[in-house]
Regions:
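Post-signal-peptide N-terminal segment of Sec-exported extracytoplasmic proteins
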Residues: 46-85
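A short, surface-exposed interaction/processing loop segment used at functional sites
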Residues: 38-39, 147, 151-153, 158-159
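Mature extracytoplasmic domains of secretory-pathway proteins
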Residues: 69-131
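Bacterial Sec-dependent N-terminal signal peptides
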Residues: 19-49, 171
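An anionic, turn-rich surface loop/hairpin at beta-sheet edges
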Residues: 135-153
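Sec-dependent bacterial lipoprotein signal peptides
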Residues: 1-20
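A short amphipathic beta-strand at an alpha->beta junction
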Residues: 156-171
Length: 171
C-alpha cells in the first residue's frame, strides 16, 4: 500500500510541476493560452480528487465522467462555481476559484497503458471554437498493456464560452 501512495504522490508532484512551469507564459506570442500557476488550495483539491492517473476509478466516482471507449476523451470547460459543483457526484468542499478571472478545464483521456505523462497543455482560440492541445510523453521502460485513464486539469485566464475540442499528441 505504501508503494501506491508513493507512486500517487510522485505523479501528483509531476503534474503540479508541469502546471506551474507553464505559469510564466499565460498568453504566448503563438496565440495559445497556457495554464496559470494555481493557488495551493486548488492543487491540493485536484491532487486529492483528480490524480493524474489511477486505476481505482475514485475520480470517476467523484466527477461526472462517462464511461469512455479506448482512446476517447472527455473534457469540460468550467466558467462558474455552479458548473464546477454540477461536475461532482458527491458533496466535497470546492477550492476557491475566482471564475470572473479564470476558467477551469477538467478532462479525462484513455490510453493503452500507464506509461505516459502529461508534458504540456495549452488552449488556442480558432474563430468560433477552441482547441485544447495536450502533449503526453511516452516514458522509458516497460509498462503492462492495461488500459489506463489519465485525468488532467488546468486553470486559465478567463476563456470564452466556445465549443472545445481536444488535440492529443503523444511524443
Amino acid at each position: 500500500m505504501a508503494f501506491i501512495g508513493n507512486k500517487f504522490g510522485l505523479v501528483s508532484c509531476v503534474v503540479a510541476i508541469v502546471l506551474c512551469s507553464c505559469s510564466n507564459k499565460e498568453h504566448g506570442p503563438d496565440g495559445f493560452s497556457y495554464p496559470v500557476a494555481p493557488p495551493s488550495e486548488v492543487v491540493s483539491f485536484f491532487d486529492t480528487y483528480l490524480p493524474a492517473s489511477e486505476s481505482s476509478s475514485l475520480s470517476d466516482m467523484i466527477f461526472n465522467f462517462p464511461d469512455l471507449d479506448y482512446q476517447s476523451n472527455e473534457y469540460m470547460l468550467v466558467n462558474s462555481r455552479k458548473e464546477f459543483r454540477d461536475l461532482l457526484t458527491v458533496e466535497v468542499p470546492l477550492p476557491d476559484i475566482d471564475f470572473k478571472k479564470y476558467s477551469l478545464i477538467i478532462g479525462k483521456c484513455t490510453l493503452g497503458d500507464p506509461g505516459y505523462v502529461l508534458d504540456e497543455q495549452a488552449v488556442h482560440t480558432e474563430g468560433d471554437h477552441m482547441k485544447l492541445q495536450l502533449q503526453y510523453r511516452r516514458l522509458d521502460g516497460f509498462f503492462p498493456c492495461v488500459v489506463t485513464d489519465f485525468y488532467f486539469w488546468g486553470l486559465y485566464q478567463k476563456l470564452p464560452d466556445l465549443p472545445l475540442e481536444v488535440d492529443l499528441d503523444i511524443i
